[in-house]
C-alpha cells in the first residue's frame, strides 16, 4: 500500500446517521480532490514569528528559546550542559533568572497560547530552575570584550541600573554605579521581603554582573546631594538615571498625617534593612497590589510584643531611621492584620497566588471598600480607619452611604502607589517629579542623559530590566554618533538562525555567481550561500493561537512548583523561601508543554502527511534548530497539507508569489 493510499484510508469516514438520496451510507471521498486537484503555484516556506510569551515579556527574554533548550530540542554546543546553555540564553536579556522566576507576575504566562488548549506553560517555574541551577553550579557570564574609551555613569543600583551595567559591559563599555544605599539591588533588596528573594541568591546574581570587571560601585552616596551632578557629568561620557521611586503615596483622606500612618515603601525598606524586627498588634493596610501583599505578609511574620517601648514602635523605627533592639527571648504574639482594597479579589493587581498565600497566613482581606477617614486619639495617633463600600462612577470610587465600618488599628500602612524622590535633581524632573524620555530612553531636555526604570513610570521589576537593556543600546548609538533607528515593532530578544548556524559551524558560504553553465543553479535551494526558504518576521509579528494547529496538542496538566506557605499559627518569624523549585525532571516535563509557537519543534507532521513525499528531513550533519525540514519543489504541488498540520504555525504557503 502506497503512502497516499494509507493517508486516504485514514481520512475515509465511517457510516453516518444520514443516508443520501442515492442510498450511499458514506460521505463522499474527497481524497482525490485533496491530493490531486488541490494544486497551486504556492509552495511552503518557513516563517519565524515571535510567540506571545516573548511579546508579553517586558525584559524581552527569548522564552521559547530557553524552553526548547530545557526540553532538549535545541541542543547545547559540545561540552556545555543543557542547564548552562539555557542559562546563557535566558541571561542574554535578563541577568536575574532566579529572582524573576520567583517574583515576576509573569505577563508572559497570561499571553501564552497554551491557554487555548488547557493551561499556560509554567514559564516562571522553569526560569527559577535555570537560575537556581546556575547558582548551585556557580555559572559565570562569558568574558567581557576589550574596553572602549567611553565610560557611563549609572545613577541607581537597582534592577534597571544593574541590567544596563551588564549590557554595557557586554558591549565593551565600563561604568560607575552610584547607589545611595549601603548595598546594590534596589527594590529587589529593599522592597521585597527576603523570603521571596533569597538574599544569598540575589547577592550571587549581582556579583556575577560585577565579576565582568570594569563596573565600579560607589555606595552610600547620593548624586545631587553628596556628589554634584556636574562632577558626574565631567567624569563620564554619558549618564543613565535609574533612581527608581522611593516615596510612598500617603492616603488622600483626613487624618492620614498621623505618625503611625506609614507608606508601604518605607515599612518594607525598614524591614528589609533589618531595622524593623517586631510590628504592631492591629495593622491595617490599604492597597491591593503586590506591595500591599508584601506589607501584610511581613506584618504577620513580625507579630507584636506587649508593652513594647514606644521609642521602638514601628513608626519610630521608620521615621527615626533607628533599629529595634528586641531580645531574642521576647515572646511574640500574632498580629491582627487586615488588607482593604477598592477592587474585588479577582480584580486586584496583586498576583493571585500571593493573595491566596496571604489569606493562608492569616491575613483578612476586605474587598470593594474605600478608606474614608483616619480616626485619631487625643495625642494625634491613629486608632482606627473608617472605610465604606464603594461603587465606581466615571472610573472613580464613590462611597456608598450607610455602609461605613470602623477598623481599629495601631498601625495604618498606605500601599497605593509610589512617587519619585528627586531632591537635588529638580531640573531633570517634570511637574510630577518623573523624568520625561523619548522612544530611545533619552532624557528629553538633557543631552547625553538617558533614563530607565520606575523614575519614568512605576512598573514591574522586569520592565525596569528591559528598559535598562534598551537604554544601554541607545547609549552605544550615542557613542557611535549613529542615527537612532526606529526600534523594532516586537522589541525583544529573538532566536537568530544565522547565529545558530555559526554556532554549529554551518554558516552559509560566500556567494559566487557561476561563470559556466549559469542555468545550472536554478534557485537558492541548491545554493550553500543562502538560507533557503526561510523568512524571519520575528521583529514584526507575534503569532496568535489562530495560526496554530491546536488539535495536535493533547491535554497535559501543568507541573506546578511546591510551596512551603506557613499557616496563621506558624507564620511568626517564618522567613524561609516559600517556593520549592522544580527538579530537573519536572522542569524538562513542564518545558515540554511549550507549543513552540512560530518555530519548528520537530514533530514530523509535515513529513508524515505530505502526499507527494516533497517534505523531507534535513540531513543530521547540516540540521539545526529552525532547519529541521525542507521541501523538494520538483515534487511539491502546493496542496498546503503541510501548512495545515503544522502545530506551531511555522509553515506558510506563499513561496513563489
Task: Explain the meaning of each model-derived region.
Residues 159-164, 285, 291-295, 323-326, ...:
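Extended, hydrophobic alpha-helical segments in both membrane/secreted and soluble proteins
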Residues 259-283, 289, 301-304, 374, ...:
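FAD-site-proximal beta/loop scaffold in flavoenzymes
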Residues 147-160, 279-289:
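Beta1/beta-strand and adjacent pyrophosphate-binding region of the FAD-binding site
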Residues 29, 61-78, 116, 120-124, ...:
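Beta1-alpha1 glycine-rich phosphate/pyrophosphate-binding loop at the start
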Residues 222-226, 267-270, 345, 372:
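Short acidic loop-to-helix transition motifs that present clustered carboxylates
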Residues 1-151, 199, 241-257, 377-380, ...:
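Ferredoxin-type iron-sulfur electron-transfer modules and their immediate structural context
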Residues 146-147, 151-153, 203-254, 373-386, ...:
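Feature captures the FAD/FMN-dependent oxidoreductase FAD-binding
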Amino acid at each position: 500500500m502506497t503512502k497516499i493510499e494509507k493517508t486516504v484510508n485514514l481520512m475515509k469516514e465511517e457510516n453516518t446517521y444520514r443516508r443520501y438520496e442515492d442510498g450511499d451510507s458514506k460521505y463522499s471521498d474527497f481524497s482525490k480532490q485533496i491530493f490531486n486537484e488541490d494544486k497551486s503555484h504556492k509552495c511552503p516556506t518557513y516563517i519565524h514569528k515571535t510567540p506571545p510569551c516573548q511579546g508579553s515579556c517586558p525584559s524581552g527574554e527569548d522564552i521559547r528559546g530557553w524552553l526548547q533548550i530545557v526540553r532538549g530540542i535545541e541542543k547545547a554546543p559540545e561540552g556545555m550542559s543543557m542547564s548552562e546553555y539555557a542559562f546563557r540564553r535566558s541571561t542574554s536579556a535578563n541577568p536575574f533568572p532566579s529572582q524573576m522566576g520567583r517574583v515576576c507576575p509573569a505577563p508572559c504566562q497570561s499571553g501564552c497560547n497554551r491557554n487555548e488548549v488547557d493551561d499556560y506553560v509554567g514559564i516562571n517555574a522553569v526560569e527559577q530552575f535555570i537560575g537556581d541551577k546556575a547558582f548551585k553550579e556557580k555559572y559565570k557570564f562569558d568574558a567581557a570584550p576589550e574596553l572602549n574609551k567611553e565610560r557611563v555613569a549609572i545613577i541607581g543600583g537597582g534592577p534597571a541600573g544593574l541590567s544596563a551595567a551588564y549590557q554595557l559591559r557586554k558591549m565593551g563599555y565600563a561604568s560607575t554605579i552610584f547607589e545611595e544605599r549601603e548595598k546594590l539591588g534596589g527594590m529587589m533588596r529593599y522592597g521585597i521581603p527576603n523570603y521571596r528573594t533569597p538574599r544569598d541568591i540575589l547577592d550571587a546574581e549581582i556579583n556575577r554582573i560585577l565579576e565582568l570587571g570594569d563596573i565600579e560601585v560607589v555606595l552610600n552616596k547620593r548624586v545631587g546631594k553628596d556628589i554634584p551632578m556636574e562632577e558626574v557629568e565631567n567624569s563620564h561620557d554619558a549618564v543613565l538615571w535609574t533612581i527608581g521611586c522611593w516615596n510612598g503615596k500617603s492616603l488622600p483622606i483626613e487624618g492620614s498625617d498621623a505618625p503611625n500612618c506609614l507608606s508601604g515603601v518605607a515599612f518594607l525598606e525598614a524591614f528589609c534593612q533589618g531595622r524593623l524586627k517586631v510590628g504592631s498588634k492591629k495593622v491595617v493596610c490599604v492597597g491591593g497590589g503586590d506591595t500591599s501583599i508584601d506589607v501584610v505578609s511581613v506584618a504577620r511574620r513580625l507579630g507584636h510584643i506587649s508593652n513594647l517601648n514606644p521609642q521602638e514602635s514601628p513608626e519610630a523605627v521608620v521615621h527615626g531611621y533607628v533599629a529595634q533592639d528586641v531580645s531574642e527571648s521576647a515572646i511574640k504574639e500574632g498580629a491582627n492584620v487586615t488588607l482593604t482594597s477598592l477592587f474585588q479579589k479577582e480584580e486586584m493587581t496583586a498576583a493571585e497566588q500571593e493573595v491566596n498565600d496571604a489569606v493562608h497566613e492569616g491575613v483578612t482581606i476586605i474587598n470593594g471598600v474605600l478608606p474614608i477617614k483616619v480616626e485619631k486619639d487625643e495625642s494625634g495617633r491613629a486608632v482606627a480607619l473608617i472605610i465604606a463600600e464603594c461603587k465606581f462612577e466615571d472610573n472613580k470610587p464613590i462611597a456608598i452611604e450607610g455602609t461605613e465600618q470602623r477598623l481599629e488599628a495601631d498601625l495604618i500602612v498606605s500601599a497605593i502607589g509610589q512617587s519619585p524622590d528627586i531632591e537635588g535633581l529638580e531640573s531633570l524632573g517634570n511637574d510630577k517629579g518623573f523624568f520625561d524620555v523619548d522612544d530611545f530612553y533619552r532624557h528629553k531636555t538633557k543631552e547625553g542623559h538617558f533614563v530607565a526604570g520606575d523614575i519614568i513610570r512605576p512598573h514591574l521589576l522586569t520592565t525596569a530590566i528591559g528598559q535598562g537593556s534598551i537604554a544601554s543600546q541607545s547609549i552605544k548609538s550615542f557613542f557611535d554618533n549613529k542615527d537612532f533607528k526606529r526600534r523594532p515593532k516586537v522589541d525583544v530578544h529573538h532566536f537568530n538562525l544565522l547565529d545558530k548556524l555559526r554556532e554549529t559551524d554551518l554558516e552559509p558560504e560566500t556567494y559566487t555567481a557561476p561563470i559556466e553553465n549559469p542555468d545550472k543553479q536554478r534557485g537558492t535551494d541548491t545554493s550553500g550561500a543562502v538560507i533557503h526558504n526561510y523568512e524571519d518576521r520575528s521583529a514584526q509579528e507575534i503569532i496568535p493561537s489562530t495560526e496554530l494547529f491546536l488539535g495536535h496538542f493533547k491535554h497535559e496538566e501543568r507541573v506546578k512548583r511546591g510551596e512551603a506557605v506557613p499557616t496563621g499559627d506558624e507564620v511568626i518569624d517564618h522567613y524561609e523561601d516559600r517556593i520549592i523549585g522544580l527538579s530537573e525532571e519536572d522542569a524538562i516535563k513542564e518545558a515540554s508543554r511549550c507549543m513552540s509557537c512560530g518555530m519548528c519543534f520537530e514533530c514530523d507532521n509535515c513529513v508524515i502527511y505530505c502526499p507527494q513525499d516533497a517534505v523531507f528531513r534535513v540531513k543530521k550533519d547540516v540540521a539545526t534548530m529552525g532547519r529541521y525540514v525542507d521541501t523538494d519543489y520538483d515534487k511539491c504541488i502546493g496542496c498546503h497539507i503541510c501548512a495545515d498540520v503544522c502545530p506551531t504555525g511555522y509553515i506558510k504557503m506563499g513561496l513563489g508569489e
